[in-house]
């Protein structure tokens, strides 16, 4: 065998295959999670009222509330609770800063009063 018969070739770069597989898996996962219904099953085998509502026919009357009925004005609402936490933390930081009467060493090396 001669040395010219064996050529060295670089291994196949399979990075693009893994990128396509990862993006495909992410797209399928996102599609699955966004297309499924997480609402509770409300109603009977014929009438489904997942968002609440009323149904009446000759033999039956059904009235279902919406899933979050009754919690619209309380602090258990996510936006109100987050706002309350941010406001409370801001007030605590401001209060602790105002109550401290000590001098603080600045990054420039000088002592500055906190007020």
UniProtKB/Swiss-Prot annotation:
Species per Swiss-Prot/TrEMBL record: Potato virus X (strain CP) (PVX)
Subcellular localization: Host endoplasmic reticulum membrane
Cytoplasmic face of the membrane: 1-13, 96-115
UniProt keyword terms in alphabetical order: Host endoplasmic reticulum, Host membrane, Membrane, Transmembrane, Transmembrane helix, Transport, Viral movement protein
Note: TGBp1, TGBp2 and TGBp3 seem to act together for cell-to-cell propagation. TGBp1 is the main movement protein that physically cross the plasmodesma with the viral genome. TGBp2 and TGBp3 would facilitate TGBp1 function.
Keyword Transport: yes
Lumenal side: 35-74
InterPro entries, per the entry: Plant_vir_prot
Highest taxon of the lineage: Viruses
Function: Plays a role in viral cell-to-cell propagation, by facilitating genome transport to neighboring plant cells through plasmosdesmata,.
GO cellular component, as recorded: host cell endoplasmic reticulum membrane; membrane
Pfam families assigned: Plant_vir_prot
Protein name: Movement protein TGB2
Transmembrane segments: 14-34, 75-95
Species lineage: Viruses, Riboviria, Orthornavirae, Kitrinoviricota, Alsuviricetes
Keyword Transmembrane helix belongs to the record: yes
GO biological process: transport of virus in host, cell to cell
Family from the record: Belongs to the Tymovirales TGBp2 protein family.
